[in-house]
């Protein structure tokens, strides 16, 4: 059971790191050198934290709770066009607003608003993919508080980086990032390729 929990934890950490790379990796490509360094540093901090804490937390689960977690995660995955996708529903108005901003980035205010929407959409996923499952797993008080702290720290690192980029990117760079991000939102679900 420990070997299974370790393997599950490592695989979940790998999936989580892929998600972070897909969300933030493109920012590094379109940014100025200093912004690129900051984005890469943020990604490294987040992925290192995930790689450290996710396998550890999974080792604390018995087989029944581990099976329940994997069952729920399986419902959030799909296989389309030869690719495995992780998906979660988002409110239609968020996707619509982001699409509108992607066609109308006329000012720094518009860019900042668009990046705030991206943070809101990502936070929907953090809740559905991380916070809600953590609650269902019913960790003991100390582990629960530790994980809540890790989740809070990593999300704030990512969100602050996105909000800062929303203030630093020019309209062309912001447009490129929005188009990159919108490719993950085909309808009312955000999909991330694994």
Language-model regions: role of each:
Residues 1-194:
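Protein-protein interaction and targeting regions used for scaffolding, dimerization, and localization
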């Amino acid at each position: 059971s420990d070997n299974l929990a370790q393997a599950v934890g490592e695989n979940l950490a790998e999936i989580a790191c892929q998600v972070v790379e897909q969300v933030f990796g493109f920012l590094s490509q379109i940014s100025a050198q200093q912004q690129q360094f900051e984005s890469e540093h943020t990604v490294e901090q987040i992925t290192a934290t995930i790689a450290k804490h996710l396998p550890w937390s999974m080792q604390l689960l018995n087989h029944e709770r581990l099976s329940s977690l994997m069952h729920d995660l399986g419902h959030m995955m799909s296989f389309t066009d030869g690719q495995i996708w992780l998906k979660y529903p988002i409110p239609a108005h968020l996707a619509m607003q982001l699409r509108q901003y992607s066609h109308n980035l006329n000012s720094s205010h518009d860019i900042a608003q668009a990046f705030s929407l991206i943070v809101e959409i990502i936070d929907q996923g953090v809740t559905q993919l991380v916070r809600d499952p953590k609650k269902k797993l019913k960790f003991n008080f100390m582990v629960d508080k530790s994980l809540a702290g890790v989740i809070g720290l990593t999300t704030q690192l990512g969100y602050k980086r996105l909000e800062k980029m929303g203030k630093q990117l020019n309209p062309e760079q912001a447009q490129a990032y929005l188009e990159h991000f919108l490719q993950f939102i085909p309808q009312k679900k955000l999909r991330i390729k694994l």
